[in-house]
Amino acid sequence: MAQALPWLLLWMGSGVLPAHGSQPGIRLPLRSGLGGAPLGLRLPRETDEESEEPGRRGSFVEMVDNLRGKSGQGYYVEMTLGSPPQTLNILVDTGSSNFAVGAAPHPFLHRYYQRQLSSTYRDLRKGVYVPYTQGKWEGELGTDLVSIPHGPNVTVRANIAAITESDKFFINGSNWEGILGLAYAEIARPDDSLEPFFDSLVKQTHVPNLFSLQLCGAGFPLNQSEALASVGGSMIIGGIDHSLYMGSLWYTPIRREWYYEVIIVRVEINGQDLKMDCKEYNYDKSIVDSGTTNLRLPKKVFEAAVKSIKAASSTEKFPDGFWLGEQLVCWQAGTTPWNIFPVISLYLMGEVTNQSFRITILPQQYLRPVEDVATSQDDCYKFAISQSSTGTVMGAVIMEGFYVVFDRARKRIGFAVSACHVHDEFRTAAVEGPFVTPDMEDCGYNIPQTDESTLMTIAYVMAAICALFMLPLCLMVCQWRCLRCLRHQHDDFADDISLLK
């Protein structure tokens, strides 16, 4: 998952409380989209919606509200494995490609996959090891029959990594026992020959090659007895559900089929452009990853964004640890000053040449509510934007504002305003466009690739240079050896003469 699972850092400080989890809150009727200064010329919308194939759009009642989770600990769906079926909760992760489940006792697991009890399990006699920035897991590969009770009415034979050992992978109290990697085969472990679950699903059934996610997040409940309420959402497999979003869907191309990589062309804080080379936003990639909690930004972009957010919210002072995600800030219940925090706009490459669209993110998304703090009279939050060394990661806190369509068949990702996102009476999340943005292709970061033929050429050149320098040296050594030999022979002859005397 871009690839690290979310972990909560616990710190103490003056007037600052340690972070633990989340408390939900106000959900008001959605108003019109957020206004703001357009980027360049704003063009008319060509069509309200693009035509879709039959079966791609419609109502998927059986799949609505099939996700559960806890704030900062991921969203999971119920799945069954084996014969007879064993039910497990599986984390939905668009930032990895392995379907992996706990298959041995673990202190944080209430249940696990028992391969020996399944008559349909097949052992592939192959191991797999997956390290993360923090944590790792390893296990054994096999296949078994898999279905999703609140999903399409199909059963598929899928590759399963049975996790036998792990470190800092499972989360205590998260209520999930495995991970469903929904990205492409290129990043599957141990290699890209291992077919991911969604590829198997599409190949073995008539399910269309797309899925969509509505992650609803958590605000604060009016009833404090609901403070431990789970987050929820929907994973629509094989289609798009109209009831889960408002307005139009806007699509950005999938740049490369490994992670769900996209191109960000501009970033604004409260309408003010960060004015950075757009390559910086995508260094070394930008991905959409439901398995990561935060919006993660490359170092330079993170520093510029935090500087702008600090300036916009300067009416209140916050400790440095807050901006690093290590400390919480709290206000008396119901008094959070949302208005002092700016909105963040990410402009994404559009499908039409030189056109982009923007998604606008509210502070209710990037300030993540946490639960179980020392005093229940306060609303406490963690700053959910963090620094990344592996590019931009649009994690769950971003996705919670939008209905996101992973249209694998057309190599594109769609965004629309989610019908369940948390907001206030003054501002809502927004998806707006099109905007004129030239030379967007230049914004993508190209990882330097050196093939074997290039390496061989370099090796030959280096060998030739070495030979060129070594040749005179070799000649000098040979000449020295010859002279030494002649001198040695002369000395031997002189010694013989002296003996004869």
UniProtKB/Swiss-Prot annotation:
Phosphoserine modification, residue list: 498
Organism: Bos taurus
Full protein name: Beta-secretase 1
Record-listed N6-acetyllysine modification sites: 126, 275, 279, 285, 299-300, 307
Activity control note: Inhibited by RTN3 and RTN4.
Substrates-to-products reaction catalysed: Broad endopeptidase specificity. Cleaves Glu-Val-Asn-Leu-|-Asp-Ala-Glu-Phe in the Swedish variant of Alzheimer's amyloid precursor protein
Motif DXXLL, residue range(s) on this chain: 496-500
The UniProt record lists the keyword Nucleotide-binding: no
Compartments, record wording: Cell membrane; Golgi apparatus, trans-Golgi network; Endoplasmic reticulum; Endosome
Cross-link Glycyl lysine isopeptide (Lys-Gly) (interchain with G-Cter in ubiquitin), where in sequence: 501
Region ranges (Disordered): 39-58
Main subcellular localisation: membrane
Gene Ontology biological-process annotations: amyloid-beta metabolic process; membrane protein ectodomain proteolysis; proteolysis
GO cellular component, one term: recycling endosome
Database matches in CDD domains: beta_secretase_like
E.C. no: 3.4.23.46
Active site residues of this protein: 93, 289
Keyword Cell membrane: yes
Domain Peptidase A1: 75-416
Cleaved signal peptide residues: 1-21
